[in-house]
Amino acid sequence: MRDCSILKKRPELLIEREIKRYIRWAVFDAHLLFNRDSIPVYAIHPHRVGDSIINGVKRLDNRLKALAARYSDDSSAHLYADDDSLLYPVFTGFLICGPILTIMTYSADPRDRTETTDSNFISQFDLGEWGQDVWNSLALVITVMHIRRTMLQLVEKGLGGIYRAEGNILSNGDTDEDL
């Protein structure tokens, strides 16, 4: 992260790639597969050069709201309309501005929001700060585990176009010790 200035690379792209790697690992570890029409439970918004931070926050907020609306419109969500245990996922958003990572959430539960409800600010981390590498990584992993748990809850309800792979999906034929 701190080498981005030496390498003349934008930190947003590096951070986005690493977040996606963490999420891919969590999905693989949980043996999750996705339909073509599956609804992601997270959004990543790297800051654009020349764009204001407020516009980035608004864009991420709109993306999270669009995911929640897409989930609400999903026909499979209405199958359990009379069920009190209907699952409304919490969508997680990552806003990346330079070395700063901001985590936001938005609930798909219509009881938790109104038309003017915005995403909730969870936390902000300076990934370029010396001595905070372990703590920042831990915070990111905890957030990714929350995303994974949300996906697993959707699998249990048969929602969101996510399902669990049958059998062993490890490429080398080994068995997964976690299962």
What are these regions (language model features)?
Residues 1-92, 99-100, 108-113, 117-179:
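A short, conserved, highly charged catalytic patch centered on acidic carboxylates
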